[in-house]
Curated annotation (Swiss-Prot):
Specifically methylates guanosine-37 in various tRNAs. Homodimer. Pfam families: tRNA_m1G_MT. It comes from the Bacteria. GO terms for cellular component: cytosol. GO terms for biological process: tRNA N1-guanine methylation. InterPro entries: Alpha/beta_knot_MTases, tRNA_m1G_MeTrfase_C_sf, tRNA_m1G_MeTrfase_TrmD, tRNA_m1G_MTases_N, tRNA_MeTrfase_TRMD/TRM10. Belongs to the RNA methyltransferase TrmD family. SUPFAM superfamilies: alpha/beta knot. It catalyses: guanosine(37) in tRNA + S-adenosyl-L-methionine = N(1)-methylguanosine(37) in tRNA + S-adenosyl-L-homocysteine + H(+). This is tRNA (guanine-N(1)-)-methyltransferase.
Length: 232
């Protein structure tokens, strides 16, 4: 079944962007997923195609209008999750991507300006999601990131299923270091265990390295991993 992605945006020309290349691009050509962009401005109510207005109560910037965005949302099918790109949203992670990849599609709303009128978020039950604790010029970049994370998990996109299972975050840890030829680079050798041919020793080394890296670089992830490990 084809995964259907819809993006509501003021800049449809930004899509598919880098998703037109590599794994996602090939999957798009093969029909594993489809992309529809919806120009929010097409649902404006005045001759100037206005989509924003000044914030109630005063303040800097402009706010996207609830009536215009609601009309754009109502134009789309209601059978898939509807996510609003927002820095105050739930953090996006690998588990979130896996859950979304199991659905039949997704609708992504790309905000601009100072934000979106809260009433349309409530009335259309938009799920706010964030890709990090920083501010972007608009939601389009975040939407592309989220789609990329989802698409690579769709059946048939990655040639080797084991590749996805061994990546960072899939087992609660960062990925172990990777090496390839040449065997010697500027005086640095590939760890001998990786060329030993002993599969269990290699697996044990990779596991220990993944745990070490996670403990050093992401103590928050390691604490969660260690807690889950103690439960099993």
């Amino acid at each position: 079944m084809k995964f259907q992605a819809r993006v509501l945006t003021l800049y449809p020309e930004m899509f598919p962007g880098f998703l037109g290349y590599s794994l996602a691009g090939h999957a798009l050509e093969r029909g594993i997923w489809s992309l529809e962009t919806v120009q929010i401005r097409d649902f404006a109510l005045d001759k100037h195609h206005s989509v924003d207005d000044t914030p109630a109560g005063g303040g800097a910037g402009m706010v996207m209008r609830a009536d215009v965005l609601a009309a754009a949302l109502d134009h789309c099918p209601q059978d898939s999750p509807r996510l609003l790109m927002s820095p105050r949203g739930r953090p996006f992670d690998q588990a979130y991507a896996r859950r979304l990849a199991d659905d039949s599609g997704i609708t992504l709303v790309c905000g601009r300006f100072e934000g979106v009128d809260e009433r349309v978020i409530e009335a259309r039950e938009l799920e706010e999601v964030s890709i990090g604790d920083y501010i972007l010029s608009g939601g389009e970049t975040a939407a592309l990131v989220i789609l990329d994370a989802i698409i690579r998990l769709l059946p048939g996109v990655m040639g080797n299923k084991a590749s996805a299972k061994c990546e960072s975050f899939e087992n609660g840890l960062l990925e172990h270091p990777q090496y390839t030829r040449p065997s010697l680079f500027e005086g640095r050798e590939i760890p001998p265990v990786l060329t030993s041919g002993h599969h269990k020793a290699i697996a044990d080394w990779r596991q220990s390295q993944a745990e070490l890296l996670t403990r050093q670089r992401r103590p928050d992830l390691y604490a969660r991993y260690d807690k889950n490990r103690q439960k099993t």
